[in-house]
Design a protein with these regions (language model features):
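Active-site metal-binding motif and surrounding structural segment of the metallo-beta-lactamase
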Residues: 44, 55-102
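Short glycine-/acidic-enriched loop or helix-start segments at secondary-structure transitions
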Residues: 23-24, 88-89, 112-113
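Metallo-beta-lactamase
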Residues: 5-9, 103-143
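Conserved beta-strand hairpin/beta-sheet module of binuclear metal-dependent hydrolase folds
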Residues: 4-64
Length: 143
């Protein structure tokens, strides 16, 4: 069952909660677990901002599919490659064959080191001040 939250008319939180963890980074107490934030922007084009930890993949994917409501996912924006933010990249590439992954050069260096999937023709490498237009929403890359 999906669990999402509208942030605005066009932005929906599609992340999830992991109540199993008691320590963040095995150091800091988190008595109520941790929340993995991911946002889906629906415009002329669609963009998912980050993914989540593998421990909540099922919930996360249900949230995305529910929010897309049959629409295609155009872009996945990867802000950084920590495992709790990028564990679902491969699954999204499989589910959405036209999906483009947006990130900086280091993102794709790390992605190729961590994963064994083909990114040929599926990446958009951004540099400072590049923009990504989804329609009414435009994202500007600030490094």
């Amino acid at each position: 069952m999906y669990c999402t939250r509208a942030v605005s008319d066009a932005v929906t939180w599609v992340g999830g909660n992991d109540r199993r963890l008691s320590l963040f980074e095995n150091l800091f107490p988190i008595p109520r677990g941790v929340t993995y934030n991911s946002y889906l922007i629906l415009d002329e084009k669609t963009a998912l901002i980050d993914t989540v930890d593998a421990s909540i993949s099922r919930q996360f994917l249900e949230n995305i599919m529910h929010t897309l409501a049959g629409r295609h996912l155009d872009y996945l924006v990867v802000n950084h490659m920590e495992p709790d933010h990028c564990a679902n990249i491969e699954e999204l590439l499989l589910r959405f064959p036209e999906l483009k992954v947006v990130g900086n050069a280091k993102t794709f260096t790390l992605m190729r080191q961590f994963y064994d999937f083909d990114l040929e023709g599926r990446i958009i490498t951004v540099v400072e001040n590049d923009t990504l237009s989804l329609g009414a929403h435009v994202s500007t890359n600030k490094l």
